[in-house]
C-alpha cells in the first residue's frame, strides 16, 4: 500500500507473458506502470538484460539473465545488500547451504549475483512427484536445524553478533503498522466498517501474545523466509538460499512460522493439495521440535504473519485472514 488511502502498487503477471510488471491500483482503477521507476534508476537498462522476475515498485527488482541474477535497489542501498551477502557466506555452513556470489557491483543501486541451479521448493510442488517433493522438504528441514543451532566458529559468531535485532517488540510494532495502514486505506469503505473492530481486536491479541510470553533464545534468522527463496538440489549438494535483505538475530519461530504460513495460505487458496501441504508442514514442525521452539512462540509469530497478509488488495484475503485467526484461536482454546 501507498500512504494515500485507496492507493496500492502491485507486482502483476499476465498469462502467456513471461516475467512480471508493476501496476498501480488507485481508487479502484488499475493501470500498468511504465518501465521507468523514479526510485529505481537502474531498472530500465537492467530489465533489458533478461526477464523481470520480481518487482516491488519503488523499492527493488530482480532480473534473471542468462547466467546471473541482477538485483536493482533504491539509490545507495546496494552496498548494504552486498555486505549482507558477504556476511552470510561466512555464517552459513557450506555443506548445507549455498549463497549467490557477487559478480559485480556496477553502481550504488545494482548488483549482479551468480545463479544457483535448481528449482525452488515452491516450484518443486508443480514439477516433482510425491517422493521427490517429500525428499526436498526433508533435506531442507535437516539442513535448517544445525544451521540455526550452530555452533559457529569465531568468524561466524562475529557476523551473527553484528546482525540487527528482530525482536518480538519489533514484530508487534509491525503488526500495528499493518493494522493502522489498513484502517487508513479503508476508512471510507462502508462495507468494511463492521470489520474494523474485529481487526483491531485481532491485532491486540497478536501483539499481546508476542509480548506476553518469554522469548526463545536469539539465533540467526533469514528474516523473511518462504519456499521461493530455497533452491532444491539433488544428492548431497547443498541447498541454495536467496535474499538476505532482512537477515537478523531473532527467535527461530520467526522464519519457521513464515514458511509455514505461506504453505497454509496456498492450501487455503486451493493452490496446494492437502497431501503436499501435510508433507511440507510436517517437516516445518520437525524443525520446530528439534530447535525446541516454544509452541506459544511459534503460534504468536504465525498469527503475526497471517495478520501481515491482511493488507493485500486481493479479493477475499482480508476475510480469510480474520477467519484463520479466529479458527486458530478457537482450536488452541479447545486444546486441538
Question: Across the structure, where does each feature detected by a protein language model lie?
Answer:
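Phosphate/pyrophosphate-binding loops and the adjoining catalytic core of nucleotide-dependent enzymes
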Residues: 1-114, 119-124, 133-156, 296-300
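Extended hydrophobic-aromatic, low-complexity segments
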Residues: 8, 79, 232-234, 239-242, ...
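An alpha-helical support segment within catalytic cores of ATP-dependent transferases
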Residues: 43-49, 149-222, 233, 288-290, ...
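Active-site acidic catalytic loop and adjacent metal/ATP-binding pocket
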Residues: 52, 61-65, 70, 207-254
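A glycine-centered beta->alpha junction motif in the catalytic cores
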Residues: 67, 75-76, 91, 105-132, ...
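Hydrophobic alpha-helical core bundles mediating ligand binding, dimerization, or RNAP-core interactions
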Residues: 137-141, 145, 199, 203, ...
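Active-site activation/catalytic loop segments of kinase-like enzymes and analogous catalytic loops
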Residues: 255-292, 303-320
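Amphipathic, Lys/Arg-enriched alpha-helical patches that create a basic surface
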Residues: 328-336
Amino acid at each position: 500500500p501507498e500512504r494515500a488511502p485507496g492507493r496500492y502498487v502491485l507486482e502483476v503477471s499476465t498469462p502467456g507473458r513471461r516475467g512480471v510488471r508493476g501496476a498501480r491500483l488507485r481508487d479502484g482503477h488499475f493501470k500498468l506502470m511504465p518501465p521507468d521507476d523514479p526510485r529505481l534508476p537502474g531498472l530500465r537498462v537492467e530489465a533489458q538484460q533478461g526477464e523481470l522476475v520480481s518487482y516491488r515498485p519503488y523499492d527493488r527488482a530482480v532480473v534473471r539473465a542468462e547466467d546471473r541474477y541482477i538485483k536493482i535497489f533504491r539509490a545507495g542501498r546496494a552496498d548494504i545488500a552486498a555486505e549482507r551477502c558477504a556476511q552470510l557466506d561466512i555464517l552459513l555452513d557450506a555443506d548445507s547451504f549455498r549463497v549467490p556470489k557477487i559478480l559485480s557491483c556496477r553502481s550504488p543501486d545494482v548488483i549482479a549475483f551468480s545463479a544457483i541451479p535448481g528449482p525452488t521448493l515452491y516450484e518443486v510442488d508443480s514439477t516433482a512427484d510425491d517422493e521427490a517433493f517429500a525428499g526436498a522438504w526433508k533435506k531442507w528441514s535437516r539442513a535448517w536445524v544445525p544451521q540455526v543451532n550452530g555452533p559457529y566458529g569465531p568468524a561466524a559468531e562475529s557476523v551473527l553478533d553484528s546482525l540487527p535485532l528482530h525482536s518480538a517488540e519489533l514484530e508487534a510494532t509491525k503488526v500495528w503498522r499493518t493494522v493502522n495502514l489498513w484502517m487508513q486505506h479503508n476508512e471510507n469503505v462502508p462495507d468494511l466498517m463492521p470489520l474494523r473492530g474485529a481487526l483491531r481486536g485481532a491485532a491486540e491479541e497478536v501483539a499481546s501474545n508476542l509480548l506476553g510470553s518469554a522469548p526463545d533464545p536469539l539465533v540467526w534468522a533469514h528474516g523473511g523466509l518462504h519456499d521461493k527463496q530455497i533452491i532444491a538440489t539433488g544428492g548431497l549438494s547443498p541447498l541454495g538460499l536467496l535474499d538476505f535483505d532482512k537477515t537478523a538475530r531473532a527467535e527461530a519461530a520467526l522464519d519457521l512460522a513464515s514458511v509455514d504460513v505461506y504453505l497454509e495460505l496456498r492450501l487455503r487458496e486451493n493452490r496446494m493439495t492437502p497431501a503436499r501441504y501435510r508433507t511440507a508442514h510436517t517437516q516445518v514442525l520437525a524443525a520446530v521440535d528439534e530447535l525446541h521452539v516454544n509452541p506459544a512462540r511459534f503460534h504468536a509469530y504465525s498469527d503475526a504473519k497471517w495478520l501481515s497478509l491482511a493488507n493485500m488488495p486481493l479479493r477475499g484475503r482480508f476475510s480469510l485472514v480474520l477467519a484463520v485467526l479466529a479458527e486458530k484461536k478457537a482450536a488452541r482454546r479447545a486444546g486441538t
